[in-house]
């Protein structure tokens, strides 16, 4: 007797999505409150998610890992048709929007790393600009923070 392959469920419970995606059910509800994902309600008023939500949650997790704010993720999702399953080509276009920001962050982190050798332990990254060693710090007149590292 031949076994039939189990048919994939069209709709998933929040618990199933949480288990498959590795995020808490509360995170799913939060993402939904921010408009990043959508659910439908069954006759018992319980949330159910279409299977494509797994891909969207994966994208959210990736974007958050690289520091992309949820609002930016939402803007990117906003240009996609609702209920649309993202293709590899569309993912490439979507991720390219974030690449420039990621490159800028990498550049800043590399600059910070390279300046650490000059740190004297006071939290400042440059002895020549340190207000303790250089009370007349000219950069301080232009504002607070890492003035040499910030892009204006």
Swiss-Prot record:
One of its GO terms (biological process) is response to oxidative stress. [2Fe-2S] cluster binds at residues 119, 122, 124, 130. Homodimer. Keywords: 2Fe-2S, Activator, DNA-binding, Iron, Iron-sulfur, Metal-binding, Transcription, Transcription regulation. Residues 11-79 form the HTH merR-type domain. This is Redox-sensitive transcriptional activator SoxR. GO terms for molecular function: 2 iron, 2 sulfur cluster binding; DNA binding; DNA-binding transcription factor activity; metal ion binding. Residues 119-130 are annotated as: Might be part of a sensor region. It comes from the Bacteria. The gene is soxR. CDD domains: HTH_SoxR (cd01110). Activates the transcription of the soxS gene which itself controls the superoxide response regulon. SoxR contains a 2Fe-2S iron-sulfur cluster that may act as a redox sensor system that recognizes superoxide. The variable redox state of the Fe-S cluster is employed in vivo to modulate the transcriptional activity of SoxR in response to specific types of oxidative stress. Residues 14-33 bind DNA.
């Amino acid at each position: 007797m031949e076994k039939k392959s189990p048919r994939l469920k069209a709709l998933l419970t929040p618990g199933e999505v949480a288990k498959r995606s590795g995020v808490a059910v509360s995170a799913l509800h939060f993402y939904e409150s921010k408009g990043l994902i959508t659910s439908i309600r069954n006759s018992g008023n319980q949330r159910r998610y279409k299977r494509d939500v797994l891909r969207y949650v994966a994208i959210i997790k990736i974007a958050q890992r690289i520091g992309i704010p949820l609002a930016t993720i939402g803007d990117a999702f906003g240009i996609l048709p609702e209920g649309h399953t993202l293709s590899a080509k569309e993912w490439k276009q979507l991720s390219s929007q974030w690449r420039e920001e990621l490159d800028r962050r990498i550049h800043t982190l590399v600059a910070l790393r390279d300046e650490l050798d000059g740190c004297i332990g006071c939290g400042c990254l440059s002895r020549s600009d340190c207000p303790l060693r250089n009370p007349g710090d000219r950069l301080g007149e232009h504002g607070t923070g890492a003035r040499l590292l910030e892009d204006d």
